[in-house]
Amino acid sequence: MFKLFIIGLVGGLLSGLLGVGGGVIFVPLLTYMTTKNFKVNTGISSMAIIFVASASGFTYIMNGITLTFNILYLIVGGIVGGYIGSKLTAMIKTKSLEKIFSVLLVIVSIRMFLNGNFESSFNENPFFYIIIGIVTGILSGLLGIGGGIVRIPLLIIFGGLENIVAQGFSLIATIPTAMTAAVTKLKGNPELIKQGTYIGLFG
């Protein structure tokens, strides 16, 4: 329990300080501080992200972020992608997943360096939101991340959303995406579900 508390607390603090999603922090901490393998940790991380994203998303809504109908397309794409990514996890070797995760960390570093400054072009085509949802959902299901580190720039560039609106969209879409990934990976294992819940609540 203490390790889960530390993982949730440290993950939550670093996520807030660095402006990155919880999964980018939770997965490495779980891998370092527990004896579970990488694939299991991605499922636990997805479970934790449900709670972290719910709290953050609620804050954005309370602060007046307006959600358009396009959020539904993003959510549908995320659910489909989350399921696909979760199924792919079982088919890909652990070492390969770890390498993919390492590449993601490099992308995170680059995005932090760019400080979220992206040129955008307004687009209301639902197709773009569905594709963005699927692509980021696959990453979420595959690696146990929220997907915002990729989803937000795509929403700004292809959806023409302002940064703060894109963040709100991303957080809301993360919740059902992470739920899909967590249920697919952890179904039938209440102990792992409980661990992910604790981390999410502590975060």
Q: Would you name each region that the model predicts?
A:
Residues 42, 46, 163-171:
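Small-residue hotspots at the loop-to-helix junctions and early N-terminal turns
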Residues 1-17, 25-27, 31-33, 38-40, ...:
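Juxtamembrane transmembrane-helix boundary motif
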Residues 47-55, 172-180:
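Membrane-embedded alpha-helical segments of transport systems
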Residues 148-149, 173:
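Alpha-helix initiation and capping sites
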